[in-house]
Amino acid sequence: MDRAIEIDFRTISVVGLGYIGLPTATVLASRQRELIGVDINQHAVDTINQARIHIVEPDLDMLVRAAVSQGYLRATTEPEPADAFLIAVPTPFLEDKQPDLTYIEAAAKAIAPVLKRGDLVVLESTSPVGATEQLSAWLSEQRSDLSFPHQLGEESDIRVAHCPERVLPGHVLRELVENDRIIGGMTPRCSQAAQRLYELFVRGRCIVTDARTAEMCKLTENAFRDVNIAFANELSMICDEIGVNVWELISVANRHPRVNILQPGPGVGGHCIAVDPWFIVDAAPESARLIRTAREVNDAKPHYVLDRVKQAARRFKEPVIACFGLSFKANIDDLRESPAIEIVRTMVQQQLGTVLVVEPHIKVLPASLEGVELLNAEPALSRADIVVLLVDHQKFRKLDTDRLQSRVVIDTRGMWSAKRLAA
């Protein structure tokens, strides 16, 4: 049998120790494998080696503490030899909405010097179709002494595959283990090797396909979500125009056995749903009309929210605006592509009033929000003329809605509106 399939993967390297990479490394370490985490962020590396975490994810702190103290997990800024390399680095898009693969290229150049015959390289980063093949090409440029799948196919020295993460922030540790995984190797043997690696910790099914299908699968999943969210967001704007409560409307419409409308919000954020559909649009701009339109609807929703805040602010001489929530979804600290950040930043730029922020999951505001105060809920409410709910954190559900009676409330998530409807 091929060595890459027989190999026991005793030593595994995870490149990129963020919201996906660190939990993945930790789960693998819990299977008593030696995990070498690699990140260019020295603070993250030092924090992990002190058995602490630099991100917020339920229960991750306990697992990292155990993995580091037992000697199964350590972090470094420089790659070291391993049997398998999992690349989990960001894949943003450029200003023209084209994919930016510079982080993947940098990861390839970083690990190339320590590769040896029989190693497996898996790209976990959500990527445009063809990125796994490009990764193989970048690796081969650095290591002419080794062969890669795009050169020799099944006979290559190095195995390369794509296995996109498909977890929900706040539930990452459970979903890493329980969710099905899509594994797309550049060759069948690449797929077999990657499948063997993921079966070390995945209890869900490991479904094997080719690399390009695996890449497109993740993009499709997120585009599907984006289109459905766009429907809900557009519906919320229509309901505002015609005087219908969108939260009640969705609640009763979803009583139909074949209708499942999602909940609207202030936009769409995060590093997946707000980004990945553009990879499809970039690949097939003439055909991806619905996907493009959905992105445009969701990208426009923060401006719609801002218009409502502007209208409310005109009622006050010196308005104080309290914004509840900054993260891109509830109960996490991840601010990437957050529509709430865009909304708050624009409020400040347009000088709509004094802007306060309540975000229980962070201790320091991003530098882009200069001039904004970070407060707890009670002092923010005491000072506010206008209250804008941007993220439906669980902690905000406990707020006494009677405190909102004398204030202008813009509830973009329906949390307080739905609570009043149910009362």
UniProtKB/Swiss-Prot annotation:
Q: Which NCBIfam families match?
A: NDP-sugDHase, PRK11064.1
Q: Where does NAD(+) bind?
A: 11-28
Alphabetically, the GO molecular function entries are: NAD binding; oxidoreductase activity, acting on the CH-CH group of donors, NAD or NADP as acceptor; oxidoreductase activity, acting on the CH-OH group of donors, NAD or NADP as acceptor
Q: What class of enzyme is it?
A: oxidoreductase
Catalytic residues (positions): 218, 272
- Entry EC no(s): 1.1.1.-
Which PANTHER family did the record assign?
A: UDP-N-ACETYL-D-MANNOSAMINE DEHYDROGENASE
Annotated organism of origin: Ralstonia solanacearum (Pseudomonas solanacearum)
Q: Record's Pfam families?
A: UDPG_MGDP_dh (PF00984), UDPG_MGDP_dh_C (PF03720), UDPG_MGDP_dh_N (PF03721)
Source superkingdom = Bacteria
The alphabetized list of GO BP terms reads:
lipopolysaccharide biosynthetic process
Query: Protein name, please?
Result: NDP-N-acetyl-D-galactosaminuronic acid dehydrogenase
Keywords for the protein's UniProt record, in alphabetical order: Lipopolysaccharide biosynthesis, NAD, Oxidoreductase
Quote the SMART domains the UniProt record gives. UDPG_MGDP_dh_C
Give the record's family classification: Belongs to the UDP-glucose/GDP-mannose dehydrogenase family.
Q: What does this protein do?
A: Probably involved in synthesis of sugar components of EPS I, by converting NDP-N-acetyl-D-galactosamine into NDP-N-acetyl-D-galactosaminuronic acid.
The coding gene here is epsD
